[in-house]
Amino acid sequence: MVSGAVRYYHIINGEDITSYFSFEEEFVSSYKSFLTRTPTITYIQALEETRLINISYEAFQQMLASPVLAHKIERFGRLVAEHYLCCYEDRVASFITQSPEERYLQLLQTGREILQRMPQHYIAHYLGITPVSLSRIRKRILEPVIK
């Protein structure tokens, strides 16, 4: 993605649940769907005016077959896979080891872009909670500061 912001989401019981966000200079894709050429269950929605560089599977395969580009494209693919794996591991670990409030506090430290650019209801679902729960957590955190 050259510019903009997107969210990844799933539809569960008729409700869309945000699972991830991507911003400038990040790879945007259902990577599994791209590699396996199968339909994805993940929706990707642009939330701002977004500019993308589109690479089709066929073009990707042609670059891999090119003696000049193959090693660079293989490295690119490895880096993308590593990025996805690290993000996935961090996300799973946060749901296993942290409370919703701890996940929000972590987001305050490391996810400023998400907090500044995304609507609260998407952030709530990203944290695995309802918008009402997020509001309560934010109030608890801000109360000591206000008093």
Predicted regions and their residues:
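Hydrophobic/aromatic residues within well-ordered alpha-helical segments
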Residues: I73, G77-V80, Y84, P100
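Cyclic-nucleotide recognition modules
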Residues: T18-R78
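Short beta-strand segments in beta-sandwich/barrel cores
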Residues: A5-Y9, R51-L52
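Short, Lys/Arg-enriched N-terminal segment that forms or immediately precedes the first helix
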Residues: Y84-A93
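Glycine- and acidic-residue-biased ligand/ion/polar-headgroup-sensing regions
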Residues: M1-R7, E24-E25
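Phosphate-/nucleic-acid-contacting segments
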Residues: Q98-K147
